[in-house]
Amino acid sequence: MRRLDWLDALRGLAAITVVLFHLSPQMIGNEAHLAVMRHIDLGKTAVLLFFLVSGYVIPMSLERHGSLRRFWIGRLLRIYPAYLATIALFALLAAAGLLHWQGSLRAETGAGLLAHVTMMTDLVGVRGVVRVFWTLTYEMVFYLVVTGLFAWRLHRHSAWYAAALALIAWLPLPDDLLGSTPASRRALAGVLVLGLLLTLTLIFAGRAKAAGVVAMAFVLVPAINGHPTVAGTVRSSQQALLLLAVMFAGTVIYRWQHGQIGPAAGSVALAVVAAGLIGAQWTQRAWPANVFAVATISLIAYAFRRRSMPQTLTWLGRISYSLYLQHVIVLFLLPHIIPDVGTQPLPVRVITGLTYLATVLALAWLSYRIVEQPAQRLGRRLAAKIDTRGRPHPQPSTQRAAPGTGRGENTRESV
């Protein structure tokens, strides 16, 4: 048993929940699907789980490396290959006439292309090639903010950051200060590309603190431009900051587990984030259930973290990134194969659903094997070369977590 199997199991559960959530309208009909959503939104529950796990894993990975260069080599080769493969698959199917490019991408091609370079489509205000790309926006912002905190040795104060983001979210924040017009969205997308490139250039030039300043500035974008257009999935700057607070809540759990913050600070921070999530959505009765489900599932997984996890869930966790990105593409193809699936007899819907699940799992496994794993191996080789040359940027070690992480366990991280 690997010490991080419980995190893989959480990712696996989140990934298959998203898949089933998106499939359910086809299987049980829109009315039944919406009836369930009025009580609990399983899609948002799964996304919150993903973010919580990322918040736990990313700082652990960064601090274990002790090098921003190594971290970013690993991150870039972890998230971009499957992302680009998904875009390529969509483009091939669109060229064949089976899929169509989203309207906001056709209307604002320049902004869309630039936004996809940084993965920050949701903050620019254009729809991703695949809509689920929206979550990558907040993953990337989180990576950058954590990078900045680490560069300035401010990374241990996770409880403060989680609570502060949840509280700042309640201020009267603008939703589209930087992206209210097509020209401003195009300019913002270009600035985000330059900001990311500048951050990476400074990191690899050994100027970590300068990189940290640029990286931390990215947190301003969701604070004042969280919902620039109707193409965005996040509905406000308040929601955008709360999603970042959820990721820092994952970091709070990591630091609490390893004695880097006390139980009082950890409990207060987690309570503030939970209250912020529920309070911000007080008109939607599903949100208390969403937050309760995430808390309960996380607590159960954490309680059993030293025990063997179900192999099915850990396997799903390993392929979860590709599964999350690519399952929607197969779902888009269903109407071409069986029109009006939701109106078909029950046996037809069951067979269709099982065939769909088998297909997306096989596709995700292939993507994991032929895209993700080779890229991760390349990342480890490149990182090793940096170490061999003796040029990694020295960073403060906070690795009290070493006994609980094990060697090489971040090779199975996913966002």
Regions found by a protein language model. Name each.
Residues 4-5, 34-47, 126-138, 175-195, ...:
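Interfacial loop-to-helix transition and helix-capping segments at the boundaries
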Residues 79, 83-144, 157, 167-179, ...:
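Membrane-interface helix-loop-helix regions
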Residues 44-48, 61-97, 107, 111-115, ...:
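Transmembrane alpha-helical segments and their boundary/interface "anchor" motifs
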Residues 17-22, 54, 58, 88-92, ...:
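Membrane-interfacial alpha-helical segments at the cytosolic side of multi-pass membrane proteins
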Residues 334, 374-415:
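Membrane-proximal cytoplasmic C-terminal regulatory module of class A 7TM GPCRs
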Residues 239-257, 265-373, 392:
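Alpha-helical transmembrane segments of multi-pass integral membrane proteins
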Residues 5-62, 80-83, 317-320, 324-325, ...:
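Functionally critical transmembrane alpha-helices in membrane proteins and complexes, commonly lining
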Residues 59-65, 95, 148-157, 198-208, ...:
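Structural signal for the C-terminal ends of transmembrane alpha-helices
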